[in-house]
């Protein structure tokens, strides 16, 4: 509803994370994309300088087999931070998600088509775990913590300014769509007792 006036006026907008947390809203955004409306959304974690060297570049670790991310606060608002920490590293291709936790302690397992198992521990009061990721491969492993939030937020805003100037989205819509599927499915899995949710690959 907050986006509607800008969408109707064809004003390009940046929508703070997460874009949405349910499939009904996601389909509205999909409709707007199909109509050529202009908006983007992302988490600043995508732009953390500590993670950037590993964006689609983990050759020294061999084939990635396991990724672990820790995050504080709620899955609904901060799960996207964890997901968007991982996404530029492993790329698209998430197959399933399972959340065996509860509203305060989201313990999430995801499977990726590249043969990677990913765990996210999104625990409400675990502030010490914010922005910590472990990458384990067939040849090596590393743990990284993001600390320079100024850099991440600045680069995120720069990406929006560039979008306004060029019309080129910094993140392809299909990636944003997949991320929002994961946010929504993580909630659905938890609310249904921890069942595994397989992603719909139609989009």
Predicted features and spans:
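A contiguous active-site-proximal alpha/beta segment in oxidoreductase catalytic domains
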Residues: 14, 19-77
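A general structural signal for well-ordered alpha-helical segments in protein cores
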Residues: 26, 51, 82-83, 153, ...
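Rossmann-like dinucleotide-binding domain that binds NAD(P)(H)
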Residues: 64-129, 174-181
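Interdomain hinge/lid region at the active-site interface
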Residues: 127-168
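Rossmann-fold NAD(P) dinucleotide-binding segment
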Residues: 1-15
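Glycine-centered short loops/turns at secondary-structure junctions
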Residues: 10, 36, 193-194
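C-terminal helix-rich "cap/oligomerization" subdomain common to oxidoreductases
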Residues: 4, 163-203
């Amino acid at each position: 509803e907050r986006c509607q006036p800008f969408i109707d006026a064809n004003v390009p907008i940046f929508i703070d994370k997460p874009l949405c947390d349910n499939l009904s809203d996601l389909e509205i955004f999909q409709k707007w994309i199909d109509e050529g409306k202009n908006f983007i959304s992302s988490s600043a974690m995508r732009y953390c300088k500590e993670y950037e060297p590993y964006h689609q570049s983990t050759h020294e670790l061999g084939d990635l087999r396991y990724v672990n991310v820790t995050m504080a606060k709620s899955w609904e608002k901060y799960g996207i931070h964890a997901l968007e920490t991982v996404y530029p590293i492993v790329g698209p291709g998430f197959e399933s998600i399972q959340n065996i936790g509860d509203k305060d302690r989201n313990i999430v397992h995801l499977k990726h088509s590249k043969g990677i198992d990913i765990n996210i521990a999104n625990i409400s009061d675990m502030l010490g775990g914010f922005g910590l990721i472990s990458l384990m491969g067939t040849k090596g492993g590393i743990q990284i913590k993001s600390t320079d939030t100024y850099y991440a937020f600045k680069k995120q805003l720069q990406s929006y300014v560039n979008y306004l100037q060029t019309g080129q989205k910094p993140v392809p819509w299909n990636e944003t769509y997949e991320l929002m599927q994961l946010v929504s499915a993580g909630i659905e899995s938890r609310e249904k007792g921890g069942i595994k949710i397989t992603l719909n690959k139609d989009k």
